[in-house]
Amino acid sequence: MKLSTKNIQHIEGLRERKKAKTHVEVQKQALRLFREKGYGNTTVEQIADAAEVSPSTFFRYFSTKEDVVMYNIIDPVVIEAFKAQPVGLSPIQAIRVSIKSSYDGFTAEESADLQERTKLMLKVPELRAKMLDKLTQNLEVLTKLTAERIGRSADDLAVRTFAGAVIGVIISVFFHDDENLNANLFKHIDVALTQLEAGLPL
């Protein structure tokens, strides 16, 4: 998978850009092997060999095989986009714009890889568990960012509830689209966030 220009703009310094490219190349080879051999039948050593790195180098970039699937280079882009949104936007509006603007720059290959990784997270038991850990981390990040945006404490229950609701509707889209994750994924996420913004009317 090629890194789109939009995805590497946020990465400062040659060293960091090289690290990002290595992350993506290892992930690309891992996904290829998972398709060919199955997730459970693929070893770290096989991934490292396919990516032309040593196993020790693999572990400098990823702590576990599961982390290869979890890695998402776009996360920092969404965070920076959220921070840059005009103060006149509500937190939910800022989130919607940030997600849309970040993923609009995805290449077709990047979109396909994201869909493939999401399917793996939903279908492989150990990846589901890892996904829950990742979502918990995302909840903490979103809580902190929202609190900073509106000038309230990250311990404020209302702020944490808001962040949890956002994560929850995104999870609902993943499971709704479980059998048919496709180009409509981001559209469905935006629809779900729009419903949340409207108070989840039924």
Regions found by a protein language model. Give the residues of each.
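Base-recognition residues in the alpha-helical recognition helix of bacterial helix-turn-helix
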Residues: 59-63
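Hydrophobic alpha-helical connector segments
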Residues: 80-116
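Hydrophobic alpha-helical bundle segments that form small-molecule/ligand-binding pockets
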Residues: 136-162
